[in-house]
């Protein structure tokens, strides 16, 4: 049996095209762990999330509690959380949260890029298509208890 994991690397210039393609094709589950959230990034992604919810895709977003966000961004975070909650997205707040990852069905994205806020920083993300990698990550992070 071949246990080789096939993965691909992306940077801040190539990530969103690939990620949004995966996101649009989600069938049953999306988990996004992003400690930071901005209105600019949410405006790009919210229409896709809305379509996924209309197809009954289970979406979970894990971020920091409101009081851990910088005051300059707090209003944007409150707005974005409200938009997502109105869509029926499950929002989790984890104190001290700093993980940057996503699960889209059997695809795991992990790295340094804040998916819901990235703007002009130099980042890297790895895409792994593997049910086992998804299972391992959701178990390791404790997200499996929300599934």
PLM ranges: what are they?
Residues 12, 41-42, 91:
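A conditional alpha-helix N-cap/helix-loop micro-motif detector
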Residues 7, 109-147:
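Signature of lipid phosphatidyltransferase scaffolds
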Residues 1-13, 31-37:
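Acidic/glycine-enriched edge-of-secondary-structure segments
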Residues 99-102:
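Short acidic loop-to-beta-strand element that houses the catalytic metal-binding Asp/Glu
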Residues 105-106:
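Glycine-centered positions within short beta-strands or beta-hairpins
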Residues 60, 89-94:
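General small-molecule cofactor/ligand-binding pocket signal
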Residues 19-85:
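Primarily the HKD phosphodiesterase
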């Amino acid at each position: 049996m071949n246990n080789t994991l096939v993965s691909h690397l992306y940077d801040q210039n190539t990530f969103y095209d690939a990620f949004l393609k995966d996101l649009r094709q989600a069938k049953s589950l999306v988990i996004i762990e992003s400690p930071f959230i901005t209105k600019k990034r949410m405006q790009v992604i919210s229409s896709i999330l809305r379509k996924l919810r209309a197809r009954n895709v289970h979406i979970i977003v894990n971020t920091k509690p409101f009081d851990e966000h910088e005051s300059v961004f707090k209003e944007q975070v409150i707005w974005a959380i409200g938009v997502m909650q109105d869509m029926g997205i499950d929002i989790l707040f984890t104190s001290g949260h700093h993980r940057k990852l996503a699960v889209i069905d059997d695809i795991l994205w992990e790295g340094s890029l804040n998916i819901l806020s990235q703007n002009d920083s130099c980042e890297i993300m790895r895409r792994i298509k593997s049910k086992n990698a998804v299972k391992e990550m959701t178990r390791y992070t404790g997200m499996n208890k929300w599934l």
